Amino acid sequence: EIGSGLVGSEMCIRDRYIPAMRKSELQLAFKVQRGKKTYDLPRVTVAEGVISTAEIANAQELNPAITPDKFQRIIEEKYSADIMFLIQQANLRSEQLKSEQMNALHNEIKAATEAPNKELTNINVASYASPDGGVKLNTTLAENREKNTVNYMKKSLKKGKIDADMTAEFTAQDWEGFKELVSKSNIQDKELILNVLSMYSDPEQREREIKNMSSVFKVLAEEILPQLRYSRITASVNVIGKSDEEISKLAKEDAKALSVDELLYAATLVKTNKEKAAIYAKVVEIYPNDYRGYNNLGMVQYEEGDLAAAQNNFAKAARIAPNTPEVAMNQGLISLANNDYAKAEQAFGKSAGVEELNEALGVFYMKKGDYNAAVKAFGDVKSNNAALAQILTKDYSKAKATLAGVEAPNANTYYLMAVLGARTNNEQMVVSNLKKSISMDSSKAQQAATDLEFAKFDIASLVK
């Protein structure tokens, strides 16, 4: 028996649903009091059993969130050096070509061509003229600086027997560079100079206005403008990491030879959860201070139904990285699976931006009985839980399409399809899908035998 009472004019059942209620009777008992005597009248059965379709909502079918690796097979590195020019000159000075910057650049270019895991992809020359001197003069000047720098680099590469693609461009008046340098300077009237730049877009007008500011132009000529007369040479180098085959082999034979990101990446190359768990266990062993190993090991354990082990590893991840949304969401899944909705809600509130969050919220809302909110949270997700929310809001056509789109149908998928058949009075749909469901999970026979969704259909032969 369960407790009940009146709230206003409505009956309130005080006990929560338990599976035994599927096969039960709801009876009304009456007591009549006349004077000092009380009479018990015969009980009246008003309903049999409980339709518990909402209880099919399954937190363990949700996808926990992975904390991804940052592995990049190809990493682009850039090395630069500047060649400075004197005012209104484009010739390359010897001291500039022998500077520490240039020597370092040549060494990096040479190293890139000799290293087996590096590739020199491009050398770019960008030449500039300062904004004083007029557009026509500076165009010729910047163009000549580009030409001379390119010729120098071509000769240098040829001498070193280095083959590389080369690109080049020039900027006649480097107003952007001028603005940046002035902004970072300690020049007394720099705000006045910046205002001129914002007020006038014509380069000739800008130059005239700034030259009229005699109090600051001398400082500009000495401190700012010389820095804008240069060619910048940039070498782009690809550093090529280990192949998938190399990473997979090392993950099995010598995991310590891999970085944490390479080892995390190795787990994405295997197919089974057993293989993934073995790799994540190595991450935890070799890199115990990286929360991702614990989280991802817990993720695999959750998918395998080992909630206690998953909870333990999620907790370890949270201790190392307490503000990580993915870890918080996974802890929310544990709370949801344990019917601790207050903790689940708190955890999901810390999980903004996690891709898997909306589906988790969908199940949370279903567990709370807010089916419309669940449908909204699921959006266009194709899952059993999403279809269940649509069934509970009586959107049967959409639920059917959702179930048809489930990537890996399981016993629950076909059971829900049978429920849809019952809701739409399609006996063939009920029978065929129950057969499939029971063939995948024999416990579905017992579930169907007491499910009032199928009360009007002859399924006795299926559930023996």
Give residue ranges: language-model regions:
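Canonical tetratricopeptide repeat
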Residues: 296, 330, 360, 385, ...
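Periplasmic peptidoglycan-binding/anchoring modules of Gram-negative envelope and division proteins
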Residues: 65-67, 85, 90-126, 154, ...
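Periplasmic OmpA-like peptidoglycan-binding domain that tethers envelope proteins to the cell wall
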Residues: 130-234
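Single conserved hydrophobic/aromatic residue that forms the stacking wall/gate
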Residues: 2-8, 13
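Terminal, low-structured helical/coil segments at or just beyond the last alpha-helical repeat
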Residues: 435, 439-464
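Register position in tetratricopeptide repeats
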Residues: 303-304, 337-338, 367, 392-393, ...
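Residue-level recognition of tetratricopeptide repeat
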Residues: 268, 299, 333, 363, ...
